[in-house]
A protein has these predicted regions:
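Short, flexible loop/turn elements at secondary-structure junctions
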Residues: 12, 31, 60, 130, ...
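Conserved alpha/beta catalytic core and glycan-binding cleft of carbohydrate-active enzymes
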Residues: 120-122, 137-303, 311, 332-389, ...
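Short glycine/proline-rich turn/loop motifs
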Residues: 24-27, 88-100, 144-145, 251-263, ...
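Long, intrinsically disordered low-complexity tandem-repeat segments
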Residues: 503-504, 524-608, 613
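Conserved, mostly hydrophobic/aromatic
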Residues: 8, 27, 47, 108, ...
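Carbohydrate-interacting/catalytic domains
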Residues: 1-2, 267-270, 281-289, 293-511, ...
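Alpha-helical packing segments of well-folded alpha/beta enzyme cores
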Residues: 1, 39, 43, 104-115, ...
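Substrate-binding/active-site clefts of carbohydrate-active enzymes
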Residues: 1-153
């Protein structure tokens, strides 16, 4: 089948069959259900002789309450907490280890090392890590006690996991630690010295839930759930993930993998399942598939019954198994599918916006520049006879696997001929090819660049290598110079002090320059502000001047009014003069009358001597 490892459900001794081995009582004993300890050693050796590694499921998160187990081991709470809010797990009805006790921590760490030392296990997969990390896991308010900081993190369990990983990897025997952690706890696969828990891999439960939900949809409605297909790549490099379809997904009424697929017939369901497995193989991360799902077992897994091996007599199941076998061999023979699982340079979207067509196109790369695979996954029930897509470089593209091949139960809508790229821009790439895409299918192409493209890649690779070498040599030279200086300083005991004094002097000069610059800038700002204030001050003065001028104009306006008053008085005098003329009997020259200022009283007093009076008046006028 081409598998590289097998992961066994817990083989430690346990009393309850229905627990599947997850309620362990004999941590240091292989279960007697399958034979003796020697039989188990033989099994491990045989698997290794066939090139298959063995990973064991291990349960340090909780243990059963059975009296013949670890509960109240000596009549007191030795392994568990005395306070039931800390030591009881209501979700499973089991007890929780007191990880803060050194005796308990050492017991569990020694047990993990026991299985790698005595039985040569290639890895340990830890169950229910999330229940260890959170004090309130599976509990209601009032059923748990906060940590010393008032939070829900189990600080003692966190330290236990870090200590375990440090000791485990300190053996340097190549064994790996895998965490089944279903929350967003950060740095599960980070190094303990960097604040991580120290695991090598983490199950990607988020991808499993999203992708399973997407595949359950009818193909017509998948375009509305396109995000469930592509979302995982947003966090794919936050941890070292393993993509899993485990036993938890095919029990408790969830149905088998083929049972989750839409389709009116078993063949249609198998068509969807093949596309799903193809996408899983191309997606970054290690892969895990539960037994029976590689030949499309119809029923859920039942711990009380064997797998339905008889189904292999039917073509659809045999063809599904052949397809999974082909995928596994493709995985093992192409480093692009595993070498750069946790390096963003190993993956590139060609197009992840075909939501209306329910398609994704991407490439996988290896550490070698010429190792590239192109994946085209169609989750829609529509076929594309001439589908153009962008390719990463000019070259030849050969289809090496197609889930719609007749040998796997498909319709045979494949691409038997090698495709040569054309210099036609597509998907924002300079080159493109045209292929046939079957409905519900996944096809994989090997990519061979042209000689010119190879030369360009080699030149780029040479430049990159040269740059890296130069940086390394420069760093080495700097390191060597620093070491020489350190040695000289150690010998003389003076150079270090001089360097410090010199550096302090340089810093002092720099600070002095900065201070001068700061003072100058402050002075400049102050002068600018003074100028602005002066300008603002002159403006009121101008306004005052304008106000005075306005007052003068108002005064001038008043003077004409005075003149008008005088004019009225003259008019009154003229009226009186006319009246005086009427009183006189003599004729008077108009010119003389108009210029005289006559007093009416004098004119009327001497009526008998008019000539004398008028002559006198004439002299006064002159």
């Amino acid at each position: 089948m081409g598998y590289t490892h097998v992961e066994l459900l817990p083989v430690m001794e346990h009393p309850l069959d229905a627990s599947w081995g997850y309620q362990v009582t004999g941590y240091y004993a292989p279960t007697s259900r399958y034979g003796t300890p020697d039989d188990f050693m033989y099994f491990m050796d045989y698997m290794h002789s066939q090139g298959i590694g063995v990973i064991l499921d291990w349960v340090p998160a909780h243990f059963p309450r059975d009296a013949h187990g670890l509960a109240c081991f000596d009549g007191t709470c030795v392994y568990e907490h005395q306070d039931p809010r800390k030591g009881s797990h209501p979700h499973w009805g089991t007890l929780i280890y007191n990880y803060g006790r050194p005796e308990v921590s050492n017991f569990l760490i020694a047990n993990a090392l026991f299985w790698t030392d005595k039985y040569h296990a290639d890895g340990i997969r830890m169950d229910a890590v999330a229940s260890m990390l959170y004090l309130d896991y599976g509990k209601q308010d009032g059923e748990w006690v906060a940590n010393i900081y008032g939070g829900n993190e189990n600080l003692e369990a966190v330290e236990f996991l870090k200590h375990l990983s440090s000791v485990f990897h300190g053996r340097k025997d190549g064994a790996v630690l895998i965490a089944e952690e279903s929350t967003a706890w950060p740095q599960v696969t980070g190094k303990p010295e960097d604040g991580g828990l120290g695991f090598d891999f983490k199950w990607n439960m988020g991808w499993m839930n999203d992708f399973t939900s997407y595949m359950r949809c009818d193909p017509y409605f998948r375009k509305y759930n396109y995000g469930e297909l592509t979302f995982s790549m947003l966090y794919a490099y936050s941890e070292n993930f393993v993509l899993v379809f485990s036993h938890d997904e095919v029990v408790h009424g969830k149905g088998s993998m083929i049972g989750k697929m839409p389709g009116e017939t078993l063949e249609k369901k198998a068509q969807n399942l093949r596309a799903a497995y193809g996408f899983m193989t191309g997606h970054p991360g290690k892969k895990l598939l539960f037994m029976g799902q590689d030949f499309a077992q119809v029923d859920e897994w039942n711990e009380n019954a064997s797998l339905e091996w008889n189904l292999l007599e039917y073509p659809v199941h045999q063809q599904t198994q052949d397809y999974v076998k082909a995928l596994n061999h493709l995985y093992r023979t192409h480093p692009a599918l595993y070498e750069m699982d946790y390096d963003p340079e190993g993956f590139q979207w060609i197009n992840c916006s075909y939501d209306q067509d329910s398609m994704v196109i991407f490439i996988r790369r290896s550490k070698k520049a010429d190792e590239t695979l192109l994946f085209v996954c169609n989750f829609d029930n529509m076929a594309h006879e001439k589908f153009r897509l962008g390719v990463p470089f000019a070259g030849k593209y050969k289809e090496i696997l197609n889930s719609d091949a007749e040998e796997f139960g498909g319709t045979g809508m494949t691409n038997p001929r090698v495709k040569t790229s054309k210099a036609m821009e597509w998907d924002e790439l300079e080159n493109s090819i045209e292929i046939r895409v079957a409905p519900m299918s996944c096809c994989v192409f090997s990519c061979t660049p042209t000689e010119e493209e190879k030369a360009q890649k080699n030149r780029k690779g040479t430049k990159t290598s040269a740059a890296k070498t130069a940086e390394a040599s420069k760093a080495s030279e700097n390191s060597g110079a620093e070491k020489k200086e350190e040695n000289a300083a150690r010998k003389t005991g003076v150079r270090t002090v001089k360097d410090k004094v010199r550096k302090l002097a340089e810093k002092k000069d720099e600070l002095g320059k900065k201070a001068v610059q700061t003072v100058e800038s402050v002075q400049k700002l102050a002068s600018e502000k003074v100028e602005k204030l002066t300008t603002r001050k002159t403006e009121p003065e101008k306004l005052a001047t304008k106000k005075v001028e306005a007052e003068k104009l108002t005064t001038k306006k008043v003077e004409p009014e005075k003149l008008s008053t005088k004019k009225v008085e003259v008019e009154k005098l003229s009226t009186k003069k006319v009246e005086a003329e009427k009183l006189t009997t003599k004729k008077v020259e108009p010119a003389k009358l108009s210029t005289k200022k006559v007093e009416p009283e004098k004119l009327t007093a001497k009526k008998a001597e008019p000539e004398k009076d008028f002559g006198k008046n004439d002299d006064e006028d002159k």
